[in-house]
Amino acid sequence: MIFKVYYQEDAAQMPVRERTKSLYIEGESEADVRLKLAKQNFNIEYVTAVTGAYLEYEQANSDFKVVNI
């Protein structure tokens, strides 16, 4: 399953909406995705599954790329 992760690049800084970034990653569950990203210095704000029409919409975006970690 593909998940979209909203995050801040530096876990030590307070989250600011304008600096929120996102990435797409494959995983079995939200917990699996968080475990895969645990070694990164990210402040993870939100993880959501991307399926169906939402996935098709995201794939049409030129920024869509599934990250392998």
UniProtKB/Swiss-Prot annotation:
Record bears the keyword Nucleotidyltransferase: yes
Record's keyword annotation contains Transferase: yes
Catalysed reactions, semicolon-separated: RNA(n) + a ribonucleoside 5'-triphosphate = RNA(n+1) + diphosphate
Coiled coil stretches, renumbered: none
A Pfam family reported for this protein in Swiss-Prot or TrEMBL: RpoY
NCBIfam families: PRK13667.1 (NF010188)
Assembly notes: RNAP is composed of a core of 2 alpha, a beta and a beta' subunit. The core is associated with a delta subunit, and at least one of epsilon or omega. When a sigma factor is associated with the core the holoenzyme is formed, which can initiate transcription.
Stated name of the protein: DNA-directed RNA polymerase subunit epsilon
Source species of the chain: Shouchella clausii (strain KSM-K16)
Lineage: Bacteria, Bacillati, Bacillota, Bacilli, Bacillales
